[in-house]
Amino acid sequence: MSALKSLVPARFLTLTAHLVIIITIFWSRDNNIQSCLPLEFTEDQYRTEDTRLTVALSVTLALFVLELAGFLSGVSMFNSNQALLSLITHSSACVCLSFFVFHQWPCWTYWIIFSICSVFPAVVELFLLLSQRVL
């Protein structure tokens, strides 16, 4: 199997793993929200952090739709540069988000992980889609 053809399943698996972790965080975000707050917090503070994390996770899911659309439509499936970028960023996201969940990192760290590991590959995917005149 050539190196390019082995990137396709690896990219799909890392995209899927990242998606599963995001959905898991979405369903069980209570512990992560509490780690963002001081020991004594009000209901208002909790709702604010819950809204922030919900928005961040929702935008991440929207970017996944964009990236999966480009991948599954075949526009970027065999583009080796996008495959490597996606493989590296989504693998890094899986590791970082695992630490985010298990070590209960503060919520602001999610935005750093989001900007590097979700926005960057989605923007490149958008450029690829636009260059093929798919969108």
Swiss-Prot record:
Protein topology in the membrane: Multi-pass membrane protein
Keywords assigned by UniProt, alphabetized: Cilium biogenesis/degradation, Developmental protein, Membrane, Transmembrane, Transmembrane helix
Any GO CC annotation of this UniProt entry: membrane
Membrane-spanning intervals of the chain: 7-27, 55-75, 83-103, 110-130
Function (record text): May play a role in cilia formation and embryonic patterning.
Membrane among keywords: yes
Gene Ontology process terms (BP): non-motile cilium assembly; protein localization to ciliary transition zone
Pfam families: TMEM107
Principal location: membrane
InterPro entries named in the record: TMEM107
Protein's recorded name: Transmembrane protein 107
Species of provenance: Danio rerio
